[in-house]
């Protein structure tokens, strides 16, 4: 008889919020942030990828660090890494997308295996080199999600929509790129990091919800 499955499903003292489950091969992998008990910041830990056989979801293991926080773009470890997501590219490699805390860009990691170790691959950019999140029609990037369709097309979802009082508070803390325009989707080129077409708005935010039917329940955060 197999053991019962229960929550929390990971070992005591392991905190992986924002979990994104994906099946690769015969294992279920969970990609998420890495929080610390009694911490003073959200998710200051290195990325870990926990996995289990699809036919035995009681047997969760994590054999290595998937990506260290003190990597490119964060050598001093000042920033935290928030909710990631992962997909397999047409080349068979695995691409992980994430944002540092309130840094308006999407970082891309790549690995030959689903659980890493991942290496830094670059940022999502428009064809002209502009970072996605800083273009004219872009939204603020936050907690991205990634989806590869059956036809091979790859779509990136992101967005953050703080209300006016929260935007003012964040601006006072020196965070100037906070927007309130909701969530977007962009299709990526085959290189998995270049925007292929103009971003499309999916769900309005506090700033632009009037007359849409989303008033009072606008997009806030976490496309992932």
Please annotate each region the language model reported:
Residues 1-224:
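Carbohydrate-active catalytic/glycan-binding domains of CAZyme proteins
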